């Protein structure tokens, strides 16, 4: 039988748009794994996804599994027959399981003994008989956080299922998936094309759906069309569309037949901060904002309809009518909020709980104010501006605008601060206090903003760890991992002279007696060092490089960064492997030794030429390295230390460290200890693999 194209389509009610791509990709990956596990040869597995369907198309699927030779070893001959040569129950049970008698079994003889053996030629199963079960298994493994039941069925899925189509070439595969019998019926667009029609062959998909059903099943093709049409629509009105990938993905998942249209709103709304308008357009309505070449918001937006209308202006007008009240709300909130100064909202912060054991948002504000001032003093920022920014940092949370449009927190604080006449770096700090919000996000731009951002995040870390609510597994309700990484990124990338030890101690001190975890400082630092590990692994540094630095537990992030980069460079040197091995050997020798070492090497006790040479090199190097260590020039220091390869190799080749003479032995151990201490000034390179 020849290989054929296999198609499966699961027709559903509207699937969650933000999960659609992940569902489709997982379906394809799961089914591919099932095919491989079943030893069914196949070509490319393509996935399709639209709001009301998930589908897979497999090229060149084998009609059956290959035949195979089956061997099952039974009991040893000694256990298969008793002393009289009669078959035992063990042998009979094994033979019965194989579908034969003991007499029909073969013998397997090796140098370890002799066993009963069943050998047979197993014919591969037909793909038809396997596919429905494999599809069901693949679907059962989809990442669905919440399943639904529908009708009177016991079956559960992410959304109710109405059709299942499984075709191998032009042959319908019988069977049930999710309680639905396989059929040739496909459902088209809700309002265009044919509501239902039949498909004759798997090779007709997805073209038949496009032509008869008016559904673009190819997700990436649909996304590309939306992107291209939106860019062209923006160009026609002299602008550039904000086609953020997350919104583009969501819109792609909402439509089956994308039609891109352009609409407008009243120019008077442009007096409202653009962030509030964009929040409404993107977040609520799934519209694409349009900007001019200078980055200013235009009074237009682009949206995607799910239907091709004879009167597109009617659809455009409808969307304009929908968005106008939301923009009017934003205008009203903006004008109303500006009747009060930001600081007038401070008393209301006392009515909002930050965390039951840690007090109100006003309590948090007071701590942030003090900590931001402290951080500013450490990094050379304006202390007065930092403390002022700390005082105002949460006031915008009490405004009408932020209450209604929550994602505008921070940015509205900036606009209101400017209206109140606050210093510009105070206003900017209010906007940037939450940065970085996600991996790759921009950092705060000014020193005052950095001080506020660090203070806000460290207050949360100290408080939540201080009451023992550490992140567990995937659960991190206070986003502590993001907060820790944000602090580290700011300190490292801005090269700030902050130490996690003193920073955490200050954050903890400001809580007074509220915290119950006596180990809170150490817990926070260990947690942050753990985030360092994850960050640098993502950056491409090897695990053992990071472990080598973590062994020294450096608590200044900028210093940690310099050490990691130095060790990564050291690994590229020819001497690295030998010196890492030597350090490991030295570490083991010193760990096993019970001798008390001297404070310094006694040159008069040195006997062998190799130990004298090594000691001389260490003296010379120590003078060179002292200023390098002091200035954090670790890469240069390790390059200098790489010159020790030959004297270290010679020492281990020619010198007996554990000499019988105690004075000689202790002197040599002291020499090795000093060698290791020089490397440990940077990292523990003995852990390098």
Curated annotation (Swiss-Prot):
GO cellular component: cytosol
Alphabetical list of InterPro entries matching this protein: DALR_anticod-bd, Gly-tRNA-synth_bsu, Gly-tRNA-synth_heterodimer
EC number: 6.1.1.14
One Pfam family it belongs to: tRNA_synt_2f
Entry's Gene Ontology molecular function annotations: arginine-tRNA ligase activity; ATP binding; glycine-tRNA ligase activity
Keywords: Aminoacyl-tRNA synthetase, ATP-binding, Cytoplasm, Ligase, Nucleotide-binding, Protein biosynthesis
Catalytic reaction(s) noted: tRNA(Gly) + glycine + ATP = glycyl-tRNA(Gly) + AMP + diphosphate
Major localization listed first in the record, in broad terms: cytoplasm
The family this protein is said to belong to: Belongs to the class-II aminoacyl-tRNA synthetase family.
Protein name: Glycine--tRNA ligase beta subunit
Source organism of the structure: Pectobacterium carotovorum subsp. carotovorum (strain PC1)
Encoding gene per record: glyS
């Amino acid at each position: 039988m020849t290989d054929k194209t296999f198609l499966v389509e699961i027709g559903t009610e509207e699937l969650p748009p933000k999960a659609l791509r992940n569902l489709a990709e997982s379906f394809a990956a799961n089914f591919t794994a099932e095919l491989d596990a079943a030893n069914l040869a196949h070509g490319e597995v393509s996935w399709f996804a639209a709001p009301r369907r998930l589908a897979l198309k497999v090229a060149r699927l084998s009609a059956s599994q290959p035949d195979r030779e089956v061997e099952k070893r039974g009991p040893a001959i000694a256990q298969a027959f008793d002393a009289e040569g009669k078959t035992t129950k063990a042998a009979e049970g094994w033979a019965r399981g194989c579908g034969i008698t003991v007499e029909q079994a073969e013998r397997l003889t090796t140098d370890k003994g002799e066993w009963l053996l069943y050998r047979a030629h197993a014919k591969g199963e037909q793909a038809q008989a396997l596919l429905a079960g494999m599809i069901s298994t693949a679907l059962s493994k989809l990442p669905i956080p919440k399943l639904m039941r529908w009708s009177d069925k016991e079956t559960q899925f992410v959304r109710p299922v109405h059709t299942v189509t499984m075709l191998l070439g032009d042959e319908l595969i019988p069977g049930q998936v999710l309680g639905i019998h396989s059929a040739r019926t496909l459902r088209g667009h809700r309002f265009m094309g044919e509501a239902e029609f039949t498909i004759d062959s798997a090779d007709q998909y997805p073209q038949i759906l496009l032509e008869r059903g008016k559904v673009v099943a190819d997700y990436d093709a649909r996304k590309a069309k939306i992107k291209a049409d939106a860019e062209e629509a923006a160009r026609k009105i002299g602008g550039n569309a904000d086609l953020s990938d997350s919104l583009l993905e969501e819109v792609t998942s909402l439509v089956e037949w994308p039609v891109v249209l352009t609409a407008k709103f009243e120019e008077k709304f442009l007096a409202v901060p653009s962030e509030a308008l964009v929040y409404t357009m993107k977040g609520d309505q799934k519209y694409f904002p349009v900007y001019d070449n200078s980055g200013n918001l235009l009074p237009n937006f682009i949206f995607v309809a799910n239907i091709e209308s004879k009167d597109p202006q009617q659809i455009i007008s409808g969307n304009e009518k929908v968005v106008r009240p939301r923009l009017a709300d934003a205008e009203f909130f903006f004008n109303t909020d500006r009747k009060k100064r930001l600081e007038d909202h401070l008393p209301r912060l006392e009515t909002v709980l930050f965390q039951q054991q840690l007090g109100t948002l006003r309590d948090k504000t007071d701590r942030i104010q003090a900590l931001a001032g402290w951080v500013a003093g450490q990094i050379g920022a304006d202390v007065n501006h930092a403390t002022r920014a700390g005082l105002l940092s949460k006031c915008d949370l009490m405004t009408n605008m932020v209450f209604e449009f929550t994602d505008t927190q921070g940015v509205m604080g900036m606009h209101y601060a400017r209206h109140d006449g606050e210093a510009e770096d105070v206003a900017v700090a209010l906007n940037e206090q939450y940065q970085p919000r996600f991996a790759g996000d921009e950092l705060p731009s000014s020193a005052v903003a950095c001080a506020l951002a660090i203070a806000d995040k460290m207050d949360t870390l100290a408080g939540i760890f201080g009451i023992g609510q550490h992140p567990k597994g995937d659960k991190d309700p206070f986003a502590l991992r993001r907060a820790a990484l944000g602090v580290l990124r700011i300190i490292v990338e801005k090269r700030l002279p902050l130490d996690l030890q003193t920073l955490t101690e200050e954050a903890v001190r400001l809580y007074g007696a509220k915290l119950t975890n006596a180990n809170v400082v150490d817990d926070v630092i260990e947690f942050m060092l753990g985030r360092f590990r994850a960050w640098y692994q993502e950056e491409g540094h090897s695990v053992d490089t990071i472990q080598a630095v973590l062994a020294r537990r450096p608590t200044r992030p900028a210093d940690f960064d310099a050490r990691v980069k130095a060790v990564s460079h050291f690994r590229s040197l020819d001497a690295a492997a030998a010196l890492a091995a030597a350090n490991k050997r030295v570490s083991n020798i010193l760990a096993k030794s019970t001798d008390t070492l001297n404070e310094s090497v006694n040159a008069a006790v040195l006997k062998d030429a190799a130990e004298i040479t090594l000691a001389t090199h260490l003296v010379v190097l120590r003078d060179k390295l002292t200023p390098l260590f002091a200035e954090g020039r670790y890469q240069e220091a390790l390059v200098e230390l790489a010159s020790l390869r030959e004297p270290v190799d010679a020492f281990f080749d020619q010198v007996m460290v554990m000499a019988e003479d105690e004075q000689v032995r202790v002197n040599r151990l002291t020499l090795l200890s000093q060698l290791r201490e020089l490397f440990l000034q940077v990292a523990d390179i003995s852990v390098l693999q």
